[in-house]
């Protein structure tokens, strides 16, 4: 296994209310990781649901099945040294824990809680789903007629509040955390050296008076 492959066995799982900003922040993280030379797949939870298992509804049990199926895909990707990003509401702690246990059989799992007050989410909602849910048009809608079990400090790995920070600021906080975890300590796709090696080389060149 080469240095680049060694850093592909992880999953970033974004959880939060509808319209909290999960997908927006996840996309920013994906772009940064791709630029760092990491092979990664950004799995759209809605697309997976509609294409792989359109028969599923939105009861607690069906949401759990959906989460487990996505988790299994992440597990397979991680097994093959492909990192994965998932932005899914994942409202129930029980199934978030199931997904963690499943993925950690092959890789590292990071739960990222994208926090945002429901009133702010409603104002952001571009499709008017909250309004339709409040009118009874959409049943089992998280944040209205279905609960969201907020992740605790013991459960999530990092949290960002999109009502207080911009998407870019949220992404940078997450990236700082991933740097601390060594996730961004990857092989550069052109030079084949790690960030720490690059810093060491620059320091030596500075000591020698070249920089």
Could you say what each language-model-derived stretch is?
Residues 115-118, 123-173, 181-186:
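Small-molecule kinase domains that catalyze NTP-dependent phosphoryl transfer to phosphate-bearing small molecules
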Residues 27-75:
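Conserved substrate/cofactor phosphate-moiety recognition/catalytic segment
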Residues 51, 57, 74-133:
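ATP-dependent NMP and nucleoside kinases share a basic, alpha-helical "lid"
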Residues 18:
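The conserved Walker
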Residues 14:
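Hydrophobic anchor at the beta1->P-loop junction of P-loop NTPases
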Residues 22:
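Conserved lysine of the Walker
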